[in-house]
Amino acid sequence: MNKKLIAAAITAAAGTVGVKLTADIVKEQLSSPDNKRKLLDIGHKAAMGLVGKIADSVSDKGFPYINRYDNTGFLEGNGYFIKEPAKEAKWYVGFAKASVVPPVLEGDYYIGGYLAFPPNKMNGIMNEQMVRAMAISDNSGRGIHVFAVIDCIGISGTDIRDIRNLIGDLISEKNILSVNISATHCHSGIDTDGLWGDLPKAFKHNKKEAKKGKKGEPISGKNKGFMTYLKKTSAKTIRKAVENMTPGELFFAQIPIGDYVRDKRPPYVTVNDLTSLRFVPENGGKEVNAVFMAAHPVCYGYRHREASRDFPGYLCDRMDEAGVDSLFIQGAEAAVATNRGPHIPDGLTTDEGIKAYGEAIADYVMGYDKSEYKKLSPVINVTVSELFLRADNKILELGAKLRLVNNPLVKITMADDGDKEDKSYELFLVTEVGFAVLGNELSIAMVPGELIPEIAIGGAFPDWASYHGKNWDKPSLKEILGTEIAVAGLCNDFIGYIVPDNDYGSIFAPLHYEEAVSAGEKTASNIVSAFIRMKENADKITVNKSQIISE
């Protein structure tokens, strides 16, 4: 045999053995959970580093230093809490609703909820997105609170403060202490967030505009005319709700809902009750029912092009038809999906199935045994706090710098002069957290994003099962607040997913998608710590009838 051929054969054989040995070594390394996590972390760090370099190339000229930050539009709730009903205490509630879709649509509209190339341009309206508002007071003379919800993917704190500022006169005149606006988080509505438009076009344009600071004119998935109409309509609806306030009684029930929902992320915790907050007016008028439920409205899927409210819209429509004014308020729904199988008959079209699911929940709530509802004494206490979160997630930072989203960011530095260009500053996201306590028995935790359920009710991974091998050492929001709890998610802001620190993993790890669209790995602990501080402060400023309050 030719010596060269023999040498080549030996070399090829050795190469094959070498490749196999290398593959076996890699396979053996990947079989170790610790090594697999290390590789995932390396990938995560590399990806975030790349995005960070891109973010660093975009000007942040438009973001103020902390001492120049203007928080006009922020409302902190009650100045003090009361334990017992006031002398003339009585529940007063008002309701109003309106479509936020303009009568004439001009320009491009994108469906908000799915990242698509090309983007999902709206080509029709299946049903109109709504704003629904409920004004509430305990007639203690301390003021009015408003809870409103918009059928949309999410709405930023900046846009919410714009709505509040449109009713500045009403806030002063009627002593409105808090205006809390949330999103149903439907993934089939017109984009109100900004991330779901023509991203390549926006990146190229907005990078130039960012250099102009506040004078820049960025583009995003949001239609400016639509957003203007939405804000004005929301403001008018809140005014109408306050105008419609009437006396009555308030009840609540925790209604089992576990087989209507399912969690897609371990440890598979769901809030297995929905909360029904039911107002019965003295004059025999329409009841108001606010339904707090955690489930993603993503039923129409990735390529749906017709704007729709998804199942929350059908739920409210069914209640409206029955003569009940209704609100659907999204809960701790991070990775929680609908479970339509047990309740929806076979053979329905997609839209028929979604409609049937929403109507089934509405019928279930309206038919629930009224004797199971607890009557709430007329006492409402609300506290809201601003929270500054370090913008750790470079994806969020890039989106904010490019003005694809308009969440408020500020620069925090040690420089004495707020105008000084000090490269040591860091960017912080400004958001809001808060809670309302009704009748000393039900707390509504107002959270600015998509909350992992175990943060609300417990059940987080222990150290041996979590991504980082550590315990989640924070109490649940229910433990902190010490009452029955309902969560108002995506409330007063839209900052993405809120994941327990101990399980905040690589964006490349299986079942860890949520980390890609989260403010950062310490977001959950910072938010829970804020709730602890708010509860401690509320306890300090709680008074009873025997104490004298000097305003």
Residues covered by each model-derived region:
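Hydrophobic alpha-helical topogenic segments used for membrane insertion/localization
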Residues: 2-26
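Glycan-recognition surfaces in beta-rich domains, encompassing non-catalytic CBMs
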Residues: 365
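Anionic-ligand-binding alpha/beta catalytic cores of soluble enzymes and soluble regulatory domains
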Residues: 361
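Conserved beta-alpha junction segments in alpha/beta enzyme cores
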Residues: 23-182, 186-356, 369, 375-551
